[in-house]
C-alpha cells in the first residue's frame, strides 16, 4: 500500500509542476473568412426611350437621339479563395437585343482608381478595349462573355451611384429593315455581368 501511495504522490507532484503558469504564455487563434463574389449594377433597368425621335417630314429617317447614350455604375465585392492571386474578372454579355440594333459599352475606372488600396483592396483594371480613358469607340456587346474588368484582388468598390466603375452604353442601328415600333411597350434585352476568380 505504501508503494501505491508513493507512486500516486510522485505523479501528483509531476502533474502539478507541469500545469503551473510561466512568465510567457502563447495562445493559438484562428480566423475564418468565407470567399465571396458579388456584382451589382446600380440601375436594374435602363430604358432607351426613342419615342421623341420620330421623323417630322415624309421621307426622313428615324434616327436615334440623345437618349442613345445612357450610363450607370458597376459595384462589386470579391474575397479570393486562391491565396491572394489577383486574377478575378468581371465579364459582360448581352441577350435579346432589339432586332436591327446593337449596344456598345465603355467603362471608366477612374472612380475606383482613386480608392486607397489599404482600405479597399486590390481593385481591378478596365480591359484596354473597354477603357473609356483610352478610347471613345465602344465595344459591341454580343451573347459571348467578354472580359470587362481584370486583375481583381480581394477588394470592394463601395455601393451605389458614383462608386466603382462607370458604365457608358450607346445604342446603335444595325439594320433599319429589322426595326419595329413598340407602340408604348418596350422590347427587353438583358445585359449580364459575371464576376469570377
What is each residue range found by the language model?
Residues 10-18:
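Hydrophobic h-region of N-terminal signal peptides that target proteins for export
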Residues 2-8:
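Sec-dependent signal peptide recognition
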Residues 20-141, 145-197:
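N-terminal small/polar-rich segments of proteins
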Amino acid at each position: 500500500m505504501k508503494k501505491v501511495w508513493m507512486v500516486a504522490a510522485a505523479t501528483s507532484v509531476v502533474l502539478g509542476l507541469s500545469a503551473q503558469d510561466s512568465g510567457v504564455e502563447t495562445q493559438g487563434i484562428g480566423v475564418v473568412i468565407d470567399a465571396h463574389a458579388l456584382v451589382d449594377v446600380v440601375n436594374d433597368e435602363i430604358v432607351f426611350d426613342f419615342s421623341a425621335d420620330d421623323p417630322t417630314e415624309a421621307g426622313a429617317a428615324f434616327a436615334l437621339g440623345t437618349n442613345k447614350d445612357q450610363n450607370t455604375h458597376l459595384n462589386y465585392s470579391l474575397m479570393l479563395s486562391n491565396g491572394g492571386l489577383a486574377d478575378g474578372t468581371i465579364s459582360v454579355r448581352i441577350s435579346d437585343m432589339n432586332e436591327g440594333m446593337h449596344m456598345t459599352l465603355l467603362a471608366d475606372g477612374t472612380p475606383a482608381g482613386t480608392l486607397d488600396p489599404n482600405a479597399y483592396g486590390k481593385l481591378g483594371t478596365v480591359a484596354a478595349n473597354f477603357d473609356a480613358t483610352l478610347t471613345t469607340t465602344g465595344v459591341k456587346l454580343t451573347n459571348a462573355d467578354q472580359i470587362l474588368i481584370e486583375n481583381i484582388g480581394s477588394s470592394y468598390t463601395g455601393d451605389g451611384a458614383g462608386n466603382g466603375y462607370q458604365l457608358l452604353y450607346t445604342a446603335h442601328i444595325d439594320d433599319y429593315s429589322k426595326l419595329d415600333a413598340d407602340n408604348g411597350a418596350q422590347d427587353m434585352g438583358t445585359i449580364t455581368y459575371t464576376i469570377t476568380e
